Regions:
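Positively charged
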Residues: 1-176
């Protein structure tokens, strides 16, 4: 496994719609493993392949620990070609952040429950119903695969404020 560089705003690759994965091979499995390692290293709970510059419909998540023999262990999820097939008509608001927009958070309104179809790392078809943090994470990461960022769900004013801050931060970085 290897750490990958996470692409940051305003890199235009983040706006790219990712391509479907046709077959699973060792390269795809290595990418998924690298994505998990990169996500954990960045203290994130989700990562899309487009965030590391890879044009593939791949996401990884770990929204919490699961109990196993009285020990808490990581609970990673790897999804290939994820597709949301159901969005609840009820909504929740939750603070979101993004590894590609570090240091910025905002309250985002999203459906409170989703059903997602995907393939696992063995290319077996799966379905998962998710709510709470996992449901939000799935929506957030699939948005990345469609070139959508969490700031796109904000009001125009809030989005512009964050974009101005990012621009200022980038100017300050370039001066250093």
């Amino acid at each position: 496994m290897a750490l990958r560089k996470i692409i940051k705003m305003p890199n235009s690759f983040l706006r790219k719609k990712a391509s479907a994965v046709d077959t699973i091979d060792n390269d795809i499995k290595h990418i998924l493993d690298d994505m998990l390692e990169t996500m954990y290293n960045a203290n994130g709970i989700g990562l899309a392949a487009t965030q590391i510059g890879i044009d593939k419909r791949l996401i990884v998540m770990d929204c919490g620990l699961k109990a196993d023999d009285d020990l808490l262990k990581p609970n990673p999820i790897k999804m290939i070609n994820p597709e949301i097939t159901f969005l609840s008509k009820n909504f929740n608001e939750r603070e979101e952040g993004c590894l590609s927009i570090p240091g910025h958070h905002a309250i985002v309104k999203r459906p409170d429950k989703v059903i997602v179809n995907y393939r696992d790392e063995n290319f077996k078809q799966k379905e998962l119903e998710a709510d709470d943090l996992l449901g939000v994470c799935i929506q957030h990461e699939i948005d990345h695969l469609n070139g959508i960022l969490f700031i796109d769900h904000l009001s125009r004013i809030k989005k512009e404020m964050i974009l101005k801050k990012i621009k200022k931060e980038n100017l300050n970085e370039n001066r250093s």
